[in-house]
Amino acid sequence: MSLSMRDPVIPGTSMAYHPFLPHRAPDFAMSAVLGHQPPFFPALTLPPNGAAALSLPGALAKPIMDQLVGAAETGIPFSSLGPQAHLRPLKTMEPEEDVEDDPKVHLEAKELWDQFHKRGTEMVITKSGRRMFPPFKVRCSGLDKKAKYILLMDIIAADDCRYKFHNSRWMVAGKADPEMPKRMYIHPDSPATGEQWMSKVVTFHKLKLTNNISDKHGFTLAFPSDHATWQGNYSFGTQTILNSMHKYQPRFHIVRANDILKLPYSTFRTYLFPETEFIAVTAYQNDKITQLKIDNNPFAKGFRDTGNGRREKRKQLTLQSMRVFEERHKKETSDESSSEQAAFNCFAQASSPAVSIVGTSNLKDLCPSEAESDAEAESKEEHGPEACDAAKISTTTAEEPGRDKGSPATRAQLFPAEPSRARDTARLDKASPDSRHSPATISSSTRVPGADERRSPGREGPVATKVDEARAIPAKDAFAPLSVQTDATAHLAQGPLPGLGFAPGLAGQQFFNGHPLFLHPGQFAMGGAFSSMAAGMGPLLATVSGASTGVSGLESTAMASAAAAQGLSGASAATLPFHLQQHVLASQGLAMSPFGSLFPYPYTYMAAAAAASTAAASSSVHRHPFLNLNSMRPRLRYSPYSIPVPVPDSSSLLATALPSMASAAGPLDGKAAALAASPASVAVDSGSELNSRSSTLSSGSVSLSPKLCSEKEAATSELQSIQRLVSGLEAKPDRSCSGSP
């Protein structure tokens, strides 16, 4: 039997020089007497007064222990043995052979610990204390069911180094700082029987890690200098004091004792689990560890996609605004379907998470990530184009510096382009699978004959800066074809616009070949038309001049911002309520025909052409996922009229899948009526032309259903009223031009 002794034992060789005096018991400590065998006491034990009251004919074994216990119970003053005697409660001196145990400890959640250990486990320490994750949990076995045990854990330094996280890995950064005060954590259920400990998982989840040296949680016990594990004073509490950027190793201890105060005199069984090693940090360094903790910690829900963290709140706000946008659109379309027989479908049913809804009146781009805030979107507008996941957009403006040198710097060329320069060719190509363009990308370019820009009337503020930026772009190409490149229907269905589809026969067709675009730059200065572009690519505001035959025009379903109703242009607007006619101002009052609820090319294709005169490179128009503008044509003339388009009989018609579209007048009445009920989608022939100057309405007006054909006269009168409403817009550019420096 071997017991831990505090006082040093005098070797037997030195004892020969000290005569034994039975009446001078204080010469020997009680621990020395009890710890040694009979070389000195063959048949005598030490009574308190030196007399041989307790005798044992043999070695000092269990009988003498029993006698000592009996003596203690009868009140023998052991203090008389001398001041050096360090007496422990005698019941703890019972031989351990009576209790048979072989404790075994198994670490819980070992797989999770292994995952953290592979990446380099980090534990955050704070001044107030932070719990560990994964929590330290073990399962014990092999304990004596009747004996009582105290279970503890402490955290020790794994080495004498200080670490730093550099180049995605931990490396030694120097020698360790001075060690913090020792602190052990006693399981709050201690002491308990072995049966109780083995019936449950022993968890130390309440242990907290802190870097606060002045932490006062706990109490202190003095361990004897000859203790097998520790010497000196140890504090016990709920918080362990650690140094940041140091590596630590948790330890688990089992002590068979029925009183915590007996810990310094008890035998500790210590267990180490290398996978629980960690580095203490004040903030997580490795993103992989952060994500692993978020994924596995049930208390980290605030950082998850489904939680209420800061990032998730931005996502939820985006999704909420998308829902509001869709609900508003559904309401508007349902209101219009009563009079138009559901002729107009939304271009953008914003169902892709990459589409960010911006509910403000400012012109904003699609955010690259759904969690991007509005402020970030605005900042990106100021710092140039950013690559969106949905598309890659770039805009350049080719100018002729020699043109119009005598004109004022802010004057724009808004007159009809010459026929040789008024040709904008649009080509609908089937992009190769390895194309650099994303599923639906429009690359377009036009020639810019003049370098001067004009500020749009009434909205000079947000446009003026963009005009200056556009003027700073050097000229590159004198002429570049304006082409529309799109992927096949299957690719488009997987892109940001799941509903966008093209008829197979449209591949390689030419669109609006050589037509000047009748647009007013004012509508690009954050009017109602463009406000929702970032919000799902819905507001399709740009229009080409409509056709009185009602077939080759395009529908302008420009969804305005919060307060604006869905507006339709051209003769179709004549059938709408007056509040919808007001919105026609943003879409120029030009007739647009729906194309199978969507368009073979985005409206913003034409929007960007007009936007070049005022928005140019820095405008968020050019970063729309459907735009890739190489140069722009500022020679655009605003016209509130529907422009007749003579379409050859041999040409295919830009038709729609609407079953109720018919034509009121024109050379193709019969063919248009026949195509009205056909879902087939065909393309406008490249030979069709738009007359750039048309001061009068043609004999027929566009109508979208046979029911509306009889309302030509009403439509004509309504269009005339619209003409009067917008007639002042042509005069405003002159006034703004004269007032500008």
UniProtKB/Swiss-Prot annotation:
Gene Ontology molecular functions: DNA-binding transcription activator activity, RNA polymerase II-specific; DNA-binding transcription factor activity; DNA-binding transcription repressor activity, RNA polymerase II-specific; RNA polymerase II cis-regulatory region sequence-specific DNA binding; RNA polymerase II-specific DNA-binding transcription factor binding; sequence-specific DNA binding
InterPro entries in the cross-refs: p53-like_TF_DNA-bd_sf, T-box_DNA-bd, T-box_sf, TBX2/3_TAD, TBX2_3_RD, TF_T-box, TF_T-box_CS
Domain of life: Eukaryota
Basic and acidic residues: bias regions: 377-386, 420-437
Keyword Oxidoreductase: no
Tissue note: In adults, highest levels in lung. Also found in brain, heart, kidney, liver and ovary.
Disruption phenotype annotation: Conditional knockdown targeted mainly to lung mesenchyme causes lung hypoplasia at 18.5 dpc. Conditional knockdown targeted mainly to the otic epithelium disrupts inner ear morphogenesis, which is exacerbated by simultaneous conditional knockdown of TBX2. Simultaneous conditional knockdown of TBX2 and TBX3 targeted mainly to lung mesenchyme causes severe bleeding from 10.5 dpc and embryos die shortly thereafter, perhaps as a result of knockdown in the developing heart.
GO biological process: animal organ morphogenesis; anterior/posterior axis specification, embryo; atrioventricular bundle cell differentiation; atrioventricular canal development; atrioventricular canal morphogenesis; blood vessel development; branching involved in mammary gland duct morphogenesis; cardiac epithelial to mesenchymal transition
DNA-binding feature ranges: 107-220, 241-305
Subcellular locations according to the entry: Nucleus
Entry-linked Pfam families: T-box, TBX2-3_RD, TBX2-3_TAD
Xref: CDD domains: T-box_TBX2_3-like
Polar residues bias: start-end ranges: 438-447
Any GO CC annotation of this UniProt entry: nucleus
SUPFAM superfamilies with a match to the protein in the record: p53-like transcription factors (SSF49417)
Start and end residues of each stretch annotated as Disordered: 369-469
Positions of post-translational Phosphoserine modification: 369, 432, 438, 456, 705, 736, 738, 740
Keywords: Developmental protein, DNA-binding, Nucleus, Phosphoprotein, Repressor, Transcription, Transcription regulation
Quaternary structure (record): Interacts with PML.
Annotated PANTHER family: T-BOX PROTEIN-RELATED (PTHR11267), T-BOX TRANSCRIPTION FACTOR TBX3 (PTHR11267:SF91)
Biological role: Transcriptional repressor involved in developmental processes. Binds to the palindromic T site 5'-TTCACACCTAGGTGTGAA-3' DNA sequence, or a half-site, which are present in the regulatory region of several genes. Probably plays a role in limb pattern formation. Required for mammary placode induction, and maintenance of the mammary buds during development. Involved in branching morphogenesis in both developing lungs and adult mammary glands, via negative modulation of target genes; acting redundantly with TBX2.
Protein name: T-box transcription factor TBX3
UniProt organism field: Mus musculus
